C-alpha cells in the first residue's frame, strides 16, 4: 500500500504543477505585460518538451531501472519550478526565465509521471489484480490533481500571482521523499539487452501488437485532447458568458473532473486481469462521451452543460485506467516503459492541441465544438470495437507470449 501511495504522489504533483497555472494565466498576462499567445506558451512549452523527452525517459527506465530515472527527474521538475518562482518574484522582466523554468519542469515531468505506469507493472508482476487496482489508483491521483488544481491555483494566486510557482518545488520534494523511502526497488534482470536487441524487440512488439497498440495511443490522445479542450471552453464560457471567475470558477471546473476521478477509481478496482473488462470499460466510456457531446449539441445551457460534461467525465474515467491496463498487461516489462512512453507522449500531444483548437473553433459557433468532439469520440469507439480483441489476451497469456 505504501508503494501505491508514494507512486500516486508523482502524477498528482505533476498534474498540480501544470494544471493549477491555467486559471492564473489571465492574471499572469497582465502582470507580465505579455500577449495572450505569449502567456499560453507557459503551458505549451511544458507539454512540447515533455512530448519530446518522454520516449527517451521511457527507454532509459527500461535500461537502467524505474527508480534510478524517476528520482532525478522529480528533482529536475522541482528545480524548474524553483527557477520560475525565483524569476517571477525577484526579476523585473521574468518572462524568459519563467519559460526556461517551464522547460526544465517539462524535462523532469517527462521522466516522472509516465514512468509510474510501468513501475506499477514491475512492482506487482504476476499479480494482475494488484496491477489493475494500482493503475486505477494512479489514474485517480492524476484526475484528483485535475480536480484540485483549478481551486488550488486560484487560491494561491489570490495571495500573490507568483505563489503557485513556489509550490511546485515544494510538492516535488515531498513526492521525491515519498518515493525514495517508501517505494521498494522492483526486481530487475541482471543483464540488460544490448541497444540493438532492445530496438529489435520493440519493433517486434509493434509488428505483432501494433493493431491494438496504435488504437490505444490514438484514444489516449483523443481523450486528453477533448478533456483539456473542453476545460478551456468551460473556463472561457464561465468567465466571459456567466461572469464567474476566481475560486468560484475553479470549483465549477472541478465538478466534471470529480466525476471523472470517481469513475476512474472504481474502474481501476473492477478491471482486474480480464482484458474483456478492459475493452468493456473503454467501449462504455467512449459511448458515454459520444452521447454527452451529442446532448451538448442539443442543449448547452448552464445546468445542462455541467450535467452532460459530468457524464462525459464518467466515460473518460472508465476508459483511462483500462487503456493503462491494456498496455501494462499486454507488454513485457522489459519494453513496457518504452511502449508506455509512446502512449504518454500521445496523451501530451492531446493536452497541447486541445486548448488552441477549441479556442479557434469557439470564434465560430459552439455547436461545431460539440459535433467535432462527438465525431472524435465515435471514431475512437469504432477503433476499439474492431481492433482490440478481448479473446486474444487469454490465449496469449496461456502461451506466455506478449
Curated annotation (Swiss-Prot):
Keyword Protein biosynthesis belongs to the record: no
Gene Ontology CC terms, in alphabetical order: plasma membrane
Q: Which SUPFAM superfamilies match?
A: MFS general substrate transporter (SSF103473)
Report the transmembrane regions from the record: 4-24, 39-59, 69-89, 104-124, 162-182, 212-232, 247-267, 278-298, 302-322, 342-362, 368-388
Q: Where in the cell is it found?
A: Cell membrane
What upregulates this protein?
Induced by mta.
Superkingdom of this entry's organism? Answer: Bacteria
Record keywords: Cell membrane, Membrane, Transmembrane, Transmembrane helix, Transport
State where it is primarily located: membrane
Its GO biological process annotations read: transmembrane transport
Q: Does the keyword Transcription regulation apply?
A: no
Database matches in InterPro entries = MFS, MFS_dom, MFS_Efflux_Transporters, MFS_trans_sf, Tet-R_TetA/multi-R_MdtG-like
Q: How does the record say this protein sits in the membrane?
A: Multi-pass membrane protein
| GO terms of molecular function | transmembrane transporter activity
Q: Which family does it belong to?
A: Belongs to the major facilitator superfamily.
Q: What does this protein do?
A: Involved in secretion of bacillibactin.
- List the protein's name: Bacillibactin exporter
Which gene name belongs to this protein? ymfD
Amino acid at each position: 500500500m505504501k508503494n501505491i501511495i508514494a507512486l500516486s504522489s508523482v502524477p498528482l504533483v505533476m498534474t498540480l504543477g501544470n494544471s493549477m497555472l491555467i486559471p492564473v494565466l489571465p492574471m499572469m498576462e497582465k502582470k507580465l505585460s505579455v500577449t495572450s499567445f505569449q502567456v499560453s506558451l507557459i503551458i505549451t512549452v511544458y507539454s512540447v518538451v515533455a512530448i519530446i523527452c518522454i520516449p527517451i525517459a521511457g527507454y532509459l527506465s527500461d535500461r537502467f531501472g524505474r527508480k534510478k530515472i524517476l528520482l532525478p527527474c522529480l528533482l529536475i521538475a522541482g528545480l524548474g519550478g524553483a527557477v520560475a518562482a525565483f524569476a517571477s518574484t525577484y526579476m523585473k522582466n521574468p518572462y524568459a526565465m519563467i519559460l526556461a523554468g517551464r522547460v526544465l519542469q517539462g524535462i523532469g515531468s517527462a521522466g516522472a509521471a509516465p514512468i509510474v505506469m510501468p513501475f506499477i507493472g514491475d512492482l506487482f508482476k504476476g499479480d494482475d489484480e494488484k496491477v489493475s487496482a494500482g493503475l486505477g489508483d494512479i489514474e485517480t491521483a492524476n484526475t484528483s490533481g485535475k480536480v484540485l488544481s483549478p481551486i488550488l491555483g486560484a487560491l494561491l494566486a489570490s495571495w500573490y500571482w507568483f505563489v503557485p510557482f513556489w509550490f511546485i518545488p515544494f510538492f516535488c520534494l515531498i513526492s521525491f521523499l515519498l518515493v525514495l523511502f517508501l517505494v521498494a526497488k522492483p526486481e530487475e534482470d541482471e543483464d540488460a539487452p544490448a541497444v540493438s536487441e532492445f530496438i529489435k524487440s520493440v519493433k517486434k512488439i509493434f509488428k505483432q501488437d501494433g493493431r491494438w497498440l496504435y488504437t490505444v495511443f490514438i484514444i489516449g490522445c483523443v481523450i486528453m485532447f477533448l478533456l483539456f479542450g473542453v476545460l478551456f471552453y468551460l473556463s472561457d464560457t464561465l468567465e466571459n458568458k456567466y461572469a464567474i471567475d476566481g475560486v468560484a470558477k475553479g470549483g465549477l471546473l472541478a465538478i466534471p473532473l470529480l466525476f471523472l476521478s470517481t469513475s476512474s477509481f472504481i474502474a481501476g478496482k473492477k478491471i482486474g486481469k480480464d482484458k474483456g473488462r478492459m475493452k468493456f470499460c473503454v467501449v462504455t466510456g467512449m459511448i458515454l462521451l459520444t452521447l454527452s457531446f451529442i446532448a451538448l449539441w442539443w442543449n448547452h445551457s448552464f445546468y445542462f452543460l455541467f450535467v452532460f460534461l459530468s457524464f462525459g467525465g464518467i466515460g473518460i474515467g472508465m476508459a483511462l485506467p483500462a487503456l493503462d491496463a491494456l498496455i501494462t498487461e499486454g507488454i513485457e516489462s522489459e519494453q513496457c516503459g518504452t511502449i508506455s512512453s509512446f502512449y504518454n507522449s500521445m496523451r501530451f500531444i492531446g493536452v497541447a492541441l486541445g486548448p488552441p483548437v477549441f479556442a479557434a473553433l469557439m470564434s465560430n459557433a459552439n455547436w461545431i465544438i460539440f459535433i467535432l468532439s462527438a465525431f472524435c469520440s465515435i471514431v475512437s469507439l469504432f477503433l476499439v470495437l474492431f481492433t482490440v480483441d478481448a479473446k486474444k489476451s487469454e490465449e496469449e497469456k496461456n502461451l506466455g507470449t506478449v
